[in-house]
Amino acid sequence: SNTCWGISNAYASPAGIDKGANTTQPEKRGNGTCARLDTRIETVKVLGCIDIEVCIAGTLFLGKVIEPAKNVNDPYSIISMGIPFSQKPKAIMLDLKAKVNPERKVLRATGFSKKKWFEGHDEPEVYVYLQKRWEDEKGNIYAKRIGTVRQRFDKSIPEWKNNYRIDIHYGDITNEPYFKSY
């Protein structure tokens, strides 16, 4: 495609079972279009008798998904994330709204074990990691994080927030007052 954006609508084929997910999709907004990201349970019936249920979250990122996904245990192994930057961005800006479940329960459903609820809170988040990457003469690839954006939303945002800005912080931010350990 002719875009820098990647989405999690991947075609997967774990254990020889073919399945497509559509948790990120276009949605009309005013005169344009935005990306709607959903989290939901996808079900696959195998040979008419085995139900496999997987919890899938919508994502939007810079990069692409390497398809088909053969292994759900390491999703980052099938994602090529990132695009080169030559300048020092100050922030990420977006229009957003969110529907966040107020319950303090999280569902784990991988498709290969029973669904399990545990204590926690499923929260949408925005994150950006700016890295300097290089390869040595032996082919080893290295990355050093130089900039970070990370924000979670623990409550619903029912109305659109336009031009929402999240600053990019450079250097070691672990001792800064705005640092969050998540």
Predicted regions and their residues:
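Signal that preferentially marks extracellular ectodomain short beta-strand elements
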Residues: K45-G48, D74-I83, Y164-Y178
